[in-house]
Structures are given as structure tokens and as C-alpha cells.
């Protein structure tokens, strides 16, 4: 399946909630307000449509509250999808649902070897032709190397060292082939050096805005959709020729996610 325009897979938050605790943001004692979450999801949906993205929808499933975080479903490469093998049992039920959706949409799905944990585009992001791969907290480095070998592309492994930034897409966001947003303390010293060596223009995010999930953004051309409360990043993006579009996503931060 090949799309002619930027296409984003989303899942309505019908069954979203904090049903378990698998990252430091999640607390069953601090539940998400489902009504507000739906309003925030609908605002993001409308914003992405306004930015000329094509939206594909996945049907929500009761008992799979994190299905809303569709970037974790797998890594798309042309007509193929490398399906996630989630580290936590609480999320492993998502994979058959994801697989069914992708196959019905015309993709070839590829399952991970059983011994490799891999969490999709949550931990694997392209900047240019290079695959940047976050590992240790959720995905295994061997899994990321296996995926890169299957795709025959260069991979740069990046060790994540802060449990609050457990996926690569919570602390790193490519903007173009030569630019990216990142939160330096989320990486070990080698990872920081590797990013600096391979990406000419890096935009660091300050602590307060990293905690607002500034890096967990959606980039469509020169437009960047992100959570509210990131004024420094928004200013820097404008200076670099991008147009930031903020929309509140606080209810999803309660589960460790954003846009």
C-alpha cells in the first residue's frame, strides 16, 4: 500500500484509560478524564486534517487502552510493516489487532523473532536514509539491528537512559533529512555524540518542555503539531522556517504519550 499524501493512522480513545502502570507517567490513582481525552483527540484529528494529512482510523478495542498510541503498532517500510513485539504483556494483545488492520489495508506484515522485543515507530525513526533506533527500556538492540538488516539500511543504535523517556519518539523527532528535535539527557553519552555526528542541525529541548512531550510531535512538511506548553521550542521552530501548531494533549501524557 502506497499513499500519495502524508497519511496517519489514528485510533479513537473509546477505551483509553490508565488500566496498568508500565512507565513512570502512569498511575491508576490518577485516571484520565475520558470526556476531555476525547475532546483532545478530536482536536488533534481536526488539526492534522487541516494540515492536509490523510487520516486512517483503527477500530478501538475494549481492554486495549494504549491502542490509541498507533505509532507503536509497527514500523512501516514501503509496502511492509514490521510488527511490534511488546515487552509488557499488558500491550501484547494489540499486535493481532494491528496486524489485521495492516493486512486489510494491503500491507505485508512481518512478525518479529520471538526472542526480540521491538516497539515499532516508538523506537525506530528515520532521519534521511538512516534509521535511528532507541533501545534498552522497551526495544532490544538486536531486534533493531535485525529490522535494519531486513530493510538493508544503516542503523544508529541509541541507548535510552531515562525511564521517563522510554521510547525514542518521546525524546527525538526528525524534522527533515538534516534536522531533528531531541532531549539530550534521555540518551547516554555515546547516543548524544552519535546524534551530533549524523544530524547536522539538532534542536535541543529544555527539561520543562521535554516533560510536556515536546519531542512527541507530528511533522507534516513544514508544519509541526505538538502539545501546548512548549514556547521555547515553538519559537525555535519558527526561526528555522517551521510552523508549530499546538493543541492540548495533557490527558494522554498521563499514559506517557502525546501526539
Language model features by range: what are they?
Residues 1-259:
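The feature marks the mature, well-folded catalytic cores of soluble enzymes
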Amino acid at each position: 500500500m502506497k499513499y500519495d499524501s502524508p497519511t496517519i493512522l489514528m485510533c479513537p480513545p473509546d477505551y483509553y484509560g490508565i488500566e496498568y502502570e508500565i512507565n513512570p507517567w502512569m498511575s491508576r490513582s490518577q485516571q484520565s478524564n475520558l470526556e476531555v481525552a476525547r475532546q483532545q483527540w478530536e482536536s488533534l484529528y481536526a488539526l492534522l486534517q487541516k494540515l492536509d494529512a490523510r487520516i486512517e482510523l483503527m477500530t478501538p478495542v475494549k481492554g486495549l487502552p494504549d491502542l490509541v498510541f498507533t505509532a507503536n503498532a509497527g514500523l512501516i517500510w514501503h509496502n511492509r510493516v514490521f510488527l511490534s513485539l511488546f515487552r509488557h504483556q499488558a500491550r501484547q494483545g494489540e499486535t493481532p489487532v494491528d496486524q489485521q488492520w495492516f493486512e486489510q489495508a494491503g500491507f505485508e506484515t512481518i512478525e518479529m523473532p520471538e526472542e526480540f522485543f521491538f516497539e515499532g515507530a516508538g523506537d525506530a525513526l528515520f532521519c534521511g536514509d538512516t534509521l535511528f533506533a532507541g533501545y534498552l527500556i522497551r526495544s532490544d538492540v538486536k531486534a533493531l539491528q535485525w529490522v535494519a538488516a531486513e530493510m538493508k539500511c544503516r542503523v544508529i543504535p541509541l541507548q535510552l537512559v531515562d525511564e521517563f523517556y522510554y521510547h525514542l519518539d518521546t525524546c527525538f523527532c526528525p524534522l527533515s533529512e538534516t534536522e531533528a528535535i531531541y532531549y539530550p539527557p534521555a540518551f547516554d553519552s555515546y547516543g548524544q555524540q552519535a546524534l551530533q555526528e549524523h544530524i547536522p542541525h539538532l534542536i535541543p529541548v529544555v527539561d520543562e518542555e521535554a516533560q510536556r512531550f515536546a519531542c512527541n510531535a507530528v511533522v507534516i512538511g513544514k508544519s509541526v503539531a505538538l502539545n501546548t506548553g512548549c514556547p521555547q521550542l515553538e519559537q525555535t521552530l519558527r526561526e528555522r522556517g517551521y510552523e508549530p501548531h499546538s493543541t492540548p494533549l495533557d490527558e494522554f501524557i498521563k499514559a506517557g504519550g502525546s501526539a
